[in-house]
Amino acid sequence: MKTIVEKITKEQLNTEEGKKIIGQAGDFLKEGGLVAFPTETVYGLGADALNKTASTKIYAAKGRPSDNPLIVHITNMGALDKIADIIPEVAYKVADAYWPGPLTMIFQKTEEVPYETTGGLDTVAVRMPSDEIARALIDAGGGYIAAPSANTSGRPSPTKAEHVEEDLSGKIEMILDGGAVDIGVESTILDMTVTPPMILHSPR
């Protein structure tokens, strides 16, 4: 497989060229392919979260254990209803304060979310990124993008497209090169299936 690498900036998103690049990447996702893209934390390796075959490809490309859940990326609160079975009131307050941004929340999943995406668990991890390129891609790719960091398991999380290319070229359909990412650490994880919610992971 030849991996396509396209440079894109936030300023290009509303141009014809930018729309064409995002559209092509979105089509790859809708067809069950893999696209690496920038978020505000690290580069993510995206697939259609509701397509079990696509999610399986992420594990194969990364060499990731299949019981390690993937985070589902969305762009609006309305999208949460389709994938989260029970959304406690406190989740809306937390989302209002911290989304979009580097916070992942865990909910009981609906039947829409395949076990291939959740690592066999009955819960789903959800994040709403603030990066404009990521958000444009999620919308173009169907609204639900499963995306761990875009690297072979065990390697450092990538903060530049060059890192992704060195690691995953030939294994994925496309890399969106949006330059260096802002934070370079992965998101805080908050479990919303317990009361009160519990922090499971917080970057050092």
Model regions: which residues?
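Active-site-adjacent structural elements in enzyme catalytic cores
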Residues: M1-R204
